[in-house]
Amino acid sequence: MLEDKGELSIKEVLKCLPISEKSPANWAAWCFGLILVVLILIVTGYMFVVYLRSQRKKNQLADETGGIEIENSIRDPVVINNSLASRSCSENKVKKQSPESTEQDDFSKTTVDETIKEKSEKQPKTCAQKPKVPIPKASTPKTEKLVSKEPSTEELSVKNSLTDLKNEATKMANTSSSANRTGEISVEIVSPKPTTAVQASTPEKPMSSAESAMESSIGSDISTYIVSSKRSEVNNYNMIEAGRTPPMSFSESYAQTAIPTANTPPTVVHVSKPSSETSVSIPPSSAVKK
């Protein structure tokens, strides 16, 4: 009875289920569903395992980097200290070796110099020294300069005025045109003869004929005019720089009449003794303004 009850109970259960033995389509559906469930479980398990492995690798990398940083922090000061110590040792070695190297260099230099000297002494001197020929120097023509002393302000005040000089210059031009047609004016400058007592006491000195004599002459008057004309030129130049127009005077016209032009050659007066007479040739200007 019990077995029948048990059998009936199983059969009743099977009857209650929607799947029956006579429906194969239901069985295929159930199998497909079970396969999908198994596949899903396998994939999820695999993904979980991969995730765990990646986390483990990350943790290992983090641990390794942390250990490397700790090692670097410990090694850096040690490396710095070691490098400093090695540098100091190398510098000390170089300092110790430097005097020896300099001595070796000096010794090598001296040996090279000695060998060069020995070779030069052994070799005979074949080249004969050529006789030195004196080079002739260019002869410069000796010219005697005309010396003229600039008169002081006191002498200028004593001398004649510019109008007198102008009159004398015009007279000179007239006499030269009438008397001497060759273009030269002969002027005699006579120096006073000193007494015997003065001549015995003072030694003779060379004296140029253009120096001022005891008496007034045309040469001294012209020298005074040249000094005054230079002063007037300086004053005119200063006035032009200041922006003012210099006054026109008769000094320019007199300079054209009294002073020879640049085209005429200069005259050379030879040095003479105090007790001699000299003749000075002064060429007149090309155009004389009256």
Swiss-Prot record:
Its domain of life?
A: Eukaryota
Bias-annotated ranges (Low complexity): 207-217, 274-290
Q: Segment Disordered: which positions?
A: 89-157, 172-217, 261-290
Instruction: Return the Basic and acidic residues bias intervals.
Output: 106-124, 142-152
Signal peptide range in chain numbering: none
User: Biased-composition ranges for Polar residues?
Assistant: 172-183, 193-202
Record-given protein name: Uncharacterized protein ZK353.4
Organism equals Caenorhabditis elegans
